[in-house]
Every structure is written in C-alpha cells, then in structure tokens.
Amino acid sequence: MPTSTWNRHHVLSLADFTAAEYDIVLKTAASFQEVLSRRTKKVPALQGQVVANLFFEPSTRTRSSFELAAKRLSADTLNFAASTSSMTKGETILDTAKTYLAMGTDIMVIRHKEAGVPNAIAQEMDRLGVRVSVLNAGDGQHEHPSQGLLDLFTICSLIDPANPRLELLQGKKIAIVGDILHSRVARSNIWSLIASGAQVHLAAPPTLLPKFFAEYIFGEETAPPGQLFIHWQLEPALQEADFVMTLRLQKERMTANLLPSLREYHQLFGITRAKLQLCQPNVKVLHPGPVNRGVEISSDLMDDPEFSLIQSQVTSGVAVRMALLYLIGSGKT
C-alpha cells in the first residue's frame, strides 16, 4: 500500500490536502476495492486496533460504511449513540472522547451537528500526547472529507478503473446542484474538485446559494480563476456538464422558509432525464444520500444505471474509508 509519503495523523478537512495525498487515497482505495471483490473480503491490516465510531448525529450510510470498513481491516469497533450515552446525564463531548481513549481506542471517527467538534477532539488528543487519530465523519455545515473523497474516487474509477488519479478530472465540468448553503458535502467536494483542475458549477436558488458563498469557502484567498462558477438557474450549470452532483434539501438545518414549495423546487432545480439533455451524452449523476425522490432527482433517473452512480458511491465508500483508516492507522501497529 502506498503510505510512504502519507504523514497526516488526522483527517479533518480537505482544504489543505495536497495532490499527492489525494492520489495516495485513490490508489489505496483502488487496492481495497479489489479486496472487496474477493470471496474473503478481509485483510489483517489493523488487527488489534480499536476504531470508535462516535456519532453524535443520526447516520445510516456513513456510520455503517465506517463500521464495515474497520471490520474489513480486522479492527475492533466500538459504536457510540448519543441517545443512550452518559451525555444524557451531562457528560461533555471531550470527557466522552477521553472515556473511549481510556478504553484503548486508536482511531476516533466523529460526526457532530456542530462544526469544529472533530477538530476540538483532535486538538485535545494532541495536547494529551496520545497517538489517537481523529477522522471527521461530518461536522455541521463545515465538511465531510470521506464523502468528498469517495465521490472523487467514484468518478475517477469510472474514467480509469485500473488507475484512478486526480488528473483525470482536469478540465471536466462538474455541476453541483441543490442545498449548497447547508451542505458540508458541497464544501468538501469543492476542495477536491478544485484541486483536480475541474470546472465546478454551483446551482441553487439564491436563498440556498448566497453570492458571497465563494468568499465564505475560500476566506481571504480567492478561488482559482475559471474554476468556480455560481448560478441561480439550473440550465447554465448543466450545459455540457460531464457529471452532476445533486444535494439533499436539508430542511432540518433551515431556520426560515427558504423555498416556496418542494414541487416548485423540483420543477426548477430537480434533475430529470429531460434536463440531462443539456449535458454531455454520457453524463453521470451522483447524490450523497439520503435522497428525497421526486425532489432533488426524479425517481426513475435515480434507479437508472445508465446515468446514476448513486449505488456506486455507496460501494466506493467502504473502499475509501478502508483507505483512510489504513493510512492514518498503519503507523500505530
């Protein structure tokens, strides 16, 4: 496995990922994808290590994917649920993390509704001088690094299954459509796609895509010229697009009525076969899930393997999360 140039102890964000790190993840994931195609889908890479999945927010795909990834690497797993934990009795997040540390945890996979929680736990582990890695499984509206990486792997593997790599997306047009304002997935995908040299076109109603969004993402820096575009109509984003990523409307994060109705949203921004006629003939559609059928994407299109990569994303997720756990855990054995 290509770990010789991997020096990252935690995976908290894709904002500072290098091209070399992206390629290491892609190549390692491809190796594990091959493992998952075997009859015996297990390797002893992390045997004896403990992976704790600390999910303070509901999750189906990400939590199950990380648990399966850890088990495929022969790690022992601990699964945390906030509703049945001592947090209901007043225990703090950091004290919960320290409890799992005392049990001998090697890797903590953290999801929380508030941005910055995985980073705070990583800083505390570093302050304590312990060799515990933290992997961000989604923090508020901040980032979702493993989802961004699995989306990247899904696309690159489609283009070149034998050798998925970052440069394959150079010059490709990627449309990201939907609730971009509240989406941590969009933020991670923007970082990875910009790094690849792709053209990223964001499309959403103005209430879900403020004009200052690029400044919000990049801070004092500016997006590379000719790589990030903002549209308040769908058609310009879809025109000649190679891939379309559609995002769930996160109604649970909306503090106001940002849309007239779901029906109107689907008419204007929902992805359908008819709208895909604006794209490249071999366009593919992605969605991080869970999907609101008939809102972000038509039900028939979601189930059509000619266009939809949604199930491939789920499959890719296990291999990519195996790669991340292996890369940050391989130095602990």
UniProtKB/Swiss-Prot annotation:
GO terms for molecular function: amino acid binding; aspartate carbamoyltransferase activity. Pathway: Pyrimidine metabolism; UMP biosynthesis via de novo pathway; (S)-dihydroorotate from bicarbonate: step 2/3. The keyword Transmembrane helix does not apply. It comes from the Bacteria. GO terms for cellular component: cytosol. Its EC number is 2.1.3.2. Carbamoyl phosphate binds at R61, T62, R111, H144, Q147, G289, P290. Coiled coil: none annotated. SUPFAM superfamilies: Aspartate/ornithine carbamoyltransferase. InterPro entries: Asp/Orn_carbamoyltranf_P-bd, Asp/Orn_carbamoylTrfase, Asp/Orn_carbamoylTrfase_sf, Asp_carbamoyltransf, Asp_carbamoyltransf_Asp/Orn-bd. The keyword Transferase applies. L-aspartate binds at K89, R184, R248. Belongs to the aspartate/ornithine carbamoyltransferase superfamily. ATCase family. This is Aspartate carbamoyltransferase catalytic subunit. It comes from Nostoc sp. (strain PCC 7120 / SAG 25.82 / UTEX 2576).
